Amino acid sequence: MTVKTAKPKVLVVDDERVIADTLAIILNQNGFDASAVYTGTAAVERARSVKPDLIISDVIMPDMNGIEAAINIRRLLPGCKILLFSGQAATADLLESARAQGHEFEILAKPVHPQDLLAKLRG
């Protein structure tokens, strides 16, 4: 009898739908159970219901930025790993504000190459 191990659940968050959907597809093809949402608010709601192992989120989004969403999700799921990515220079100010409040997040620069992301997740 073979015992199946659960795939790590990943939530991808980006207001650029093509990026979120593409990353979710790549992750699903590489042994993860990934889904995508397109707003920070949707990320918090989905995290509450799905309880992902990992969240990969853009920082700059129109309704709730990725750092605000990450802080809210950390309150709900303290053990959830959160990886942020952004191509915006404004991200530094947001990260500094989060650090001042006692929150630390790992950040990757956009564009994120899929192989680099997979290596980071597996490493």
PLM feature segments, named:
Residues 61:
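Receiver (REC) domain active-site loop signature in two-component systems and cognate sites
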Residues 1-9, 113-123:
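Non-catalytic signal-transmission and effector/linker regions of two-component phosphorelay proteins
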Residues 68, 72, 81, 89-109, ...:
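Alpha4 helix (beta4-alpha4-beta5 surface) of REC/receiver domains from two-component response regulators
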Residues 14:
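Conserved acidic carboxylate
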Residues 50-56:
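Active-site beta3 strand of CheY-like receiver
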Residues 38-42, 65-69:
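Acidic catalytic/metal-coordinating carboxylates
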Residues 17-35, 102-105:
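Two-component/phosphorelay signaling modules centered on CheY-like receiver
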